[in-house]
């Protein structure tokens, strides 16, 4: 993962050239912070929905078509990546004492 940057919040999207994007962590009510909070909530909701879909696919006796399985696994990988980034961002804020959750 990325190294913690003092006073900055890791955002749930990439910056230029695919590098981590940060914003100052001194205004949790600012526009960028609120947008990041909303995006993190949406990412976590999507991850939960994908997990439920995967569980349903595993619960049936007949295996799903390979293309359907591949699609769900790819989306699960995306969701896990997003979830890990949210966890990293929140962990960084906890260690600096600026966490809002």
Please identify what each model-predicted range represents.
Residues 1-101:
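Hydrophobic alpha-helical segments that drive targeting, anchoring, or assembly
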